[in-house]
Structure formats: C-alpha cells, structure tokens
Amino acid sequence: MISRFKFHPVGQGCFYSGEMYIHLFRRYNHFNMVYDCGASFDKEYLHQEIEHYKKRLFRSSLDVLFISHLDNDHVNGVSRLLEGIECNEIYLPYLAP
C-alpha cells in the first residue's frame, strides 16, 4: 500500500487530503479522501489549494469527504471543492432536530 496525506496551507482553518493506492489481487485500487475544507481569512489561498488538489485528483472522483464540525473555517470551501467532481460519500456530525 502506498499512501500520501497532506495538510494544505490555507491559514486559519483546515483542508486535509489523503490518497491511498492498494495493490490487491493483481489490481491497484485507488482511494481519495478529504477531511474538512475551509479557511477563516484569506480565501485566496484556500481556492488555490482546492484548484491544485482537483487537478491532481484521480478520475475526478472523491471517495469520501469528512466534515468534523460546521464552523465556517472548516466548511466554506466545500462547494468549490465539489464543483465539477463526483463525491461518493459525505460524513457530517450529528445534528439534533
């Protein structure tokens, strides 16, 4: 298995991504994930990091997006991240009715 993980430099906030290549039964399986995607102040850095990440994204497909909590500096880049790509699953914190 080969894996790479990165904290993207977005300033105050969080944008963390990971990718794994798993060799199984003579095939390579690829897995992409993102944990949070937001920044508080200078969103230009966030937007640059999102576009750079999307250019490198395997098959323009995200396997899973995790959102730790709904503070603005953890979610305000999600719509830009998901624009033009597929995302198989999104995990959000439990929200009481």
Regions found by a protein language model. Name each.
Residues 95-97:
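Non-catalytic, alpha-helical, charged scaffold/linker segments
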Residues 1-52, 60:
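Conserved beta-strand hairpin/beta-sheet module of binuclear metal-dependent hydrolase folds
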Residues 44-92:
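Active-site metal-binding motif and surrounding structural segment of the metallo-beta-lactamase
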